[in-house]
Curated annotation (Swiss-Prot):
Transmembrane segments: none
Active site, per annotation: 419 (proton acceptor)
Organism: Drosophila melanogaster (Fruit fly)
Protein name as catalogued: Choline O-acetyltransferase
Pfam name, any one: Carn_acyltransf
GO BP terms: acetylcholine biosynthetic process; neuromuscular synaptic transmission
Assigned GO CC terms: cytoplasm; cytosol; neuron projection; nucleus; terminal bouton
Its job: Catalyzes the reversible synthesis of acetylcholine (ACh) from acetyl CoA and choline at cholinergic synapses.
Catalytic activity field: choline + acetyl-CoA = acetylcholine + CoA
Family: Belongs to the carnitine/choline acetyltransferase family.
GO MF annotations in UniProt: choline O-acetyltransferase activity
Consequence of substituting residue 386 to L: Loss of activity
Domain of life assignment: Eukaryota
Site (described: Cleavage): 584-585
């Protein structure tokens, strides 16, 4: 993983790294002289000697050291099963001909015959016996042998570090939990304290190596899963760069440091709250609550208007990088930035958005389940994703921070998280664990919070005229982006995964086909579709892409629409109810439609399984593309091809975010002309978070949600007995 300063060097590369890992592997886990405690002591001594001889440019070792899971150095029983190279396999490099065959198959439903034929010719040249493809493939195989995860930094840079657009909406998801009922400001402080106490307890569990090992629950069940991303959630932060971003990840020394703090932001004012210190130990919940209460009472009373520094983190990455450089010209600002980066989390204490903020919906939709006053679930999701703009809470954020807990005075709460360090599953599981503990052990009457502690330190920013001007410019830029977001939380309540499973279909596969049908009903075509597939069966595995737009799905969608083509009238659009009750004559029999559906299910399942077992196409294609640049100095024509560009423009970006609580997570589209759609299947309902941009006349979040409703309805009619 990236070190404090280095961001893009290949994981575990270079002779120094190889020597270090050779040294580490010579230690054995057991009792006596080679006990874990002795290993730690020996390791520290070895590193002290190693560091004394290191040069400033020698950074490859950092990635390897920081990639060692903490639990490997613990006394827990299954240490040898936890993310270490000897037990977790490396990400594979699939055979070249297999990747190219699957690539052609993925292009068939989303390209024209002429485009596809051109691509096939390029692939023939690329894959010829004397072509460059075999050479590049061997380059990746060699890279796999030399490194812990040959694809990690290719993928990290492609997905995150090289992207220059703003984080909110475009990259950072927002998550909404069931709202609380706060009667007083003390309730807000106590709830915040309980969340932070849970974060601190989780930190202690990581440090002690007690994080339970997860195993695969499907397809070659019981395989151990890489847990590395769980160790990157707390105390980490993204750093902007003019050309490329980097990551701040806590070093082993910092993980063992007894000082723990969070940064609390209230009304754009920032405070450092120490949760645990070497000179006084861990704060109790009541003591933490007293610190939060101080912030809640102090921030509104300050005479000067606060400097909304957090607003700058919502700007395009290169712009924010230059602003950050200006901030760092003052040493006091440098210290503030360090406190934010090293904080376990950022806690944002918000004011509520107006009830009519960006209000959306459609006639016939089911009512929202959760409300906070006059605010519905869509409104609450806006607050978590972007804060509502410069007049609301967008300056009350630090969008670079991996985890921002957000609590609003009206009971709305959730989080916004920066995506580069971890996938959603690690974030969701951490917050749901803390939330369930709070629900299972309600607040006891602790009386008023204790006030014997010194107050939190308020971070004061020192900015010149140039930065003052940038705040005004950033306000306009951020507000424009937020005004363009078309976002809608839609609950489909006719059925959920209980019915889907009764049809002998995976709920994820079923919903993915519903998303394809909904798109076809509106546009008469399928488009490149992204669904994240976890590759945590492999060392430092993150995700690959399940491409749901298949030829089989296209044939089924065409048949389901009875050949009507694009902009099929939706049942929920019809004003005349009698019209919708008329008998409709089908071109295809139900048996034929069911057979097409089963074929689409089989193909979607096949693609899903290939991806989770490390045999997808997007990671290998990315590797071949980057290898062509590294080996020949230029990108091969195959990756400049129109079909490749189409395949990488994900007009439908989707992901299943399964929550055991009645929570949901949403995000914006990944392209100006596309949709974002997360989903959370429950036994008797499915929650969708649909997003689009108003600046695109061809897309509409509410209309896509309506098409989803109709698609799910007719799929039930097709499959139920």
């Amino acid at each position: 993983m990236a070190s404090n300063e280095a961001s893009t060097s290949a994981a575990g590369s270079g002779p120094e790294s190889a020597a270090l890992f050779s040294k580490l592997r010579s230690f054995s886990i057991g009792s006596g002289p080679n006990s874990p405690q002795r290993v730690v002591s020996n390791l520290r001594g070895f590193l002290t000697h190693r560091l004394s001889n290191i040069t400033p440019s020698d950074t490859g070792w950092k990635d390897s050291i920081l990639s060692i899971p903490k639990k490997w150095l613990s006394t827990a029983e299954s240490v040898d099963e936890f993310g270490f190279p000897d037990t977790l396999p490396k990400v594979p490099v699939p055979a070249l001909d297999e990747t190219m065959a699957d690539y052609i198959r993925a292009l068939e439903p989303i390209t024209t015959p002429a485009q596809l034929e051109r691509t096939k010719e390029l692939i023939r040249q690329f894959s010829a016996p004397q072509g460059i493809g075999a050479r590049l493939h061997q380059y990746l195989l060699d890279k796999r042998e030399a490194e812990d995860n040959w694809a990690y930094y290719y993928w990290l840079n492609e997905m995150y570090m090289d992207i220059r657009i703003p984080l909110p909406i475009n990259s950072n998801p927002g998550m909404v939990f069931p709202p609380r009922r706060f009667k007083t400001v003390h309730d807000v402080a106590h709830f915040a304290a309980r969340l932070l106490d849970g974060i601190l307890s989780h930190r202690e569990m990581l440090d002690s190596g007690e994080l339970p090992l997860e195993r695969a629950a499907s397809r070659e069940k019981n395989q151990p899963l890489c847990m590395a991303q769980y160790y990157r959630l707390l105390g980490s932060c993204r750093r902007p760069g003019v050309k490329q971003d980097s990551q701040f990840l806590p070093s082993r020394e910092r993980l063992n440091d007894e000082d723990r703090h969070v940064v609390v932001i209230c009304r754009n004012q920032m405070y450092c709250v120490v949760l645990q210190a070497s000179d006084r130990g861990k704060l109790s919940e009541s003591e933490i609550a007293s610190q939060i209460l101080y912030v809640l009472s102090d921030a509104p009373c300050l005479p000067a208007k606060p400097v909304p520094v957090g607003l700058l983190t919502a700007e395009p990455r290169s712009t924010w990088a230059r602003d950050r450089e200006m901030l760092q010209e003052d040493e006091r600002n440098q210290r503030n930035l360090e406190l934010i980066e090293t904080a376990q989390v950022v806690l944002c204490l918000d004011e509520p958005l107006a009830g009519n903020f960006n209000a959306r919906g459609f006639t016939g939709a089911t009512p929202t389940v959760h409300r906070a006053g006059d605010r519905d679930e869509t409104n609450m999701a806006h607050e978590m994703i972007h804060g509502g703009g410069s007049e609301y809470n967008s300056g009350n954020r630090w969008f670079d921070k991996t985890m921002q807990l957000i609590i609003c005075t009206d009971g709305t709460w959730g989080l916004c998280y920066e995506h580069s360090c971890s996938e959603g599953i690690a974030v969701v599981q951490l917050l749901e664990k803390i939330y369930k503990k709070i629900e299972e052990h309600p607040d006891e009457d602790n009386g008023l919070p204790q006030h014997h502690l010194p107050p939190p330190e308020r971070l004061e920013w020192h900015v010149g005229p140039q930065l003052q001007l940038r705040f005004a410019q950033a306000s306009k830029s951020v507000d424009k982006c937020i005004d363009d977001l078309d976002f809608y939380v839609y609950r489909y309540q006719s059925y959920g995964k209980t019915f889907i499973k009764s049809c002998q279909v995976s709920p994820d596969v079923y919903i993915q086909l519903a998303l394809q049908l909904a798109h076809y009903k509106l546009y008469g075509r399928l488009v490149a579709t992204y669904e994240s597939a976890s590759t945590r069966r492999f060392l430092h595995g993150r995700v690959d892409c399940i491409r749901a737009a298949s030829t089989e799905a296209l044939e089924w969608a065409k048949a389901m629409c009875q050949g009507e083509g694009a902009n099929v009238p939706l049942e929920s659009d019809r004003e005349d109810e009698e019209e919708s009750r008329k008998v409709k004559f089908s071109i295809y029999s139900k048996d034929h439609l069911r057979e097409l559906f089963r074929c689409a299910v089989a193909r979607q399942t096949e693609v899903m399984v290939k991806n989770i077992l490390g045999n997808g196409i997007d990671i290998p294609l990315l590797g071949l593309r980057e290898a062509s640049i590294e080996v020949t100095g230029e990108m091969h024509e195959l990756f400049k091809d129109e079909s490749y560009i189409i395949s990488q423009c994900f007009l439908l970006s989707t992901s299943q975010v399964a929550c055991s609580t009645d929570s949901f997570m949403g995000y914006g589209p990944v392209t100006p002309r596309g949709y974002g759609c997360s989903y959370n299947p429950h036994p008797e309902q499915i929650v969708f978070c649909v997003s689009a941009f108003y600046s695109c006349e061809d897309t509409s979040a509410s209309r896509y949600a309506k098409s989803l409703q109709d698609s799910l309805d007719i799929m039930r009619d097709l499959l139920q007995n």
